[in-house]
């Protein structure tokens, strides 16, 4: 059946497996970020040595033309690897991901590199975030920036899907000037907002939406870390977006919609009974405390099973926390010097009751545990002075270090921000009278000495 001259040719394909090539060269930035952040790579030579242990290195000589290796000699291979590694490290340095000291050949990971490695975010996405996020970025901007992440380029685009996306886009509140229906980033932009609006979607788009949601929280957490590292208080907006993503609600929606079976009608009934949030609903559902309990239950129109579901949410899931704090030496706070605040958070539980940290999120595709951010900020200057991410069990005691840059009286806010529930945040304020720092005193003394010297020079001239 097969000519003898081609027999060996076909036997090769039957007897030998097809080669699987490496694509590490396309993702080397991400690999280096992970290894540099964990201190596995600390120099250029470490990076070159690391690359020799990869499958990419094994395939280089086996299929050099695929990787653009022109000279397969030892010197040619060494030169190829050195150039590839040095170019990659230079890109990371220019993106302010690492600090590269060429004199002693050391590589130091910078904060963006640590963020990218911790949240498993690509180098290109981190570049986008670092260039786009600033003190003026608001909710719309964060949604646009997050959905521009390269992680969403894997979203499938189907034929005639643009018509459905167009109809969804007409119903969502946040618009952009460049509405490209053939872009995976625009699709992510539309489907994320559809999630906030709790829209019913076709099964294919629902699967795409799940893919988007599974990656959104890490991207938002990275936005929080980037903005907070720059001292921008609008990091709170990214935290609120995290809550919106988990609960499938807009920031303008009632927090009561987190309660099972609470639709617009039930929310309207609750509002008419002067119930605006989940905590007020908890109080109102106590028949011993609320004389109008019977009318409220009747007007809500929920069945006994639905009321039981609502009670389970308020009793077992929605957090009830007591936040208290104590300033350390408030009278000795000086500008530019570290100051401290002791924080205590107590969860309202019975003695024999264990804290439930599992989040009630029926619209979120994966299970999630409850986490919180503690933030010290100043609203008047939009400054974030301290931040810590914590998990709160039965109780938590911790200390935050903050630095106020300017002397004078400052009204600061201690924010306790949930990453998953809307309406559970707390934001008590406190005042600090900040004295002049040592640097300021030294500057004043230097100015006085300069003035005295000038005066002496004038006297000598006379």
Roles of regions detected by a PLM:
Residues 350, 416-426:
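Short acidic/polar inter-strand loop motif in beta-rich domains
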Residues 389, 396-407:
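Short, hydrophobic beta-strand segments
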Residues 65-70, 108, 283-305, 417-419, ...:
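Short amphipathic alpha-helical segments embedded in low-complexity Lys/Glu-rich regions
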Residues 408-412:
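Exposed beta-strand face motif in extracellular beta-rich ectodomains
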Residues 1-81, 88, 124-125:
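C-terminal helicase lobe
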Residues 30, 35-38, 76-81, 86-272, ...:
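C-terminal helical accessory/scaffold domains
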Residues 383-393:
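Solvent-exposed serine/threonine-rich low-complexity stretches and specific carbohydrate-binding patches
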Residues 436-462:
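Long acidic, serine-enriched intrinsically disordered low-complexity regions
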């Amino acid at each position: 059946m097969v000519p003898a001259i081609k027999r060996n040719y076909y036997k090769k394909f039957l007897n030998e497996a097809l080669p699987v090539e490496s694509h590490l060269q396309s993702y080397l930035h991400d690999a280096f970020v992970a290894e540099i952040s964990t201190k596995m790579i600390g120099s250029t030579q470490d990076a070159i040595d690391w690359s020799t242990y990869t499958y990419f290195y094994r395939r280089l000589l086996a299929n050099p033309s695929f990787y653009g290796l022109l000279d397969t000699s030892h010197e040619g291979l060494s030169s190829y690897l050195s150039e590839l590694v040095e170019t990659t490290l230079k890109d990371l340095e220019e993106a302010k991901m690492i600090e590269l000291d060429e004199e002693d050949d050391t590589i130091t990971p910078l904060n963006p590199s640590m963020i990218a490695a911790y949240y498993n975010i690509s180098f290109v996405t981190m570049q986008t975030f670092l260039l786009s996020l600033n003190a003026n970025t608001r909710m719309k901007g964060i949604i646009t920036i997050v959905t521009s992440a390269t992680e969403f380029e894997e979203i499938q685009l189907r034929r005639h899907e643009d018509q459905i996306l167009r109809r969804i886009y007409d119903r969502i509140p946040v618009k952009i000037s460049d509405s490209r229906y053939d872009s995976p980033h625009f699709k992510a932009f539309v489907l994320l907002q559809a999630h906030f609006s709790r829209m019913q979607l076709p099964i294919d788009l629902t699967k795409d939406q799940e893919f988007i949601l599974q990656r959104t929280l890490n991207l938002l957490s990275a936005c929080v870390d980037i903005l907070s590292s720059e001292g921008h208080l609008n990091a709170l907006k990214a935290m609120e977006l995290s809550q919106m993503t988990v609960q499938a609600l807009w920031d303008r929606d009632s927090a009561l919609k987190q309660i099972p079976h609470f639709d617009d009608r039930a929310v309207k009934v609750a509002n008419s009974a002067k119930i605006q949030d989940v905590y007020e609903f908890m109080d109102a559902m106590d028949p011993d405390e609320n004389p109008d309990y019977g009318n409220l239950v009747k007007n809500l129109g929920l069945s006994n099973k639905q009321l039981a579901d609502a009670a389970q949410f308020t009793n077992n899931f929605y957090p009830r926390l007591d936040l208290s704090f104590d300033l350390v030496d408030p009278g000795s706070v000086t500008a530019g010097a570290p100051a401290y605040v002791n924080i205590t958070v107590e969860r309202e539980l019975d003695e024999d009751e264990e804290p439930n940290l599992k989040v009630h999120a029926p619209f979120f595709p994966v299970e999630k545990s409850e986490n919180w951010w503690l933030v010290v900020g100043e609203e008047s200057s939009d400054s974030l002075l301290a931040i810590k991410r914590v998990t709160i069990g039965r109780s938590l005691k911790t200390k935050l270090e903050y630095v106020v840059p300017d002397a004078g009286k400052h009204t600061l806010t201690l924010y306790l921000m949930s990453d998953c529930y809307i309406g559970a945040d707390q934001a008590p304020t406190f005042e600090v009278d900040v004295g002049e720092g040592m640097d300021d005193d030294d500057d004043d003394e230097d100015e006085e000495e300069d003035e005295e010297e000038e005066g002496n020079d004038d006297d000598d001239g006379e």
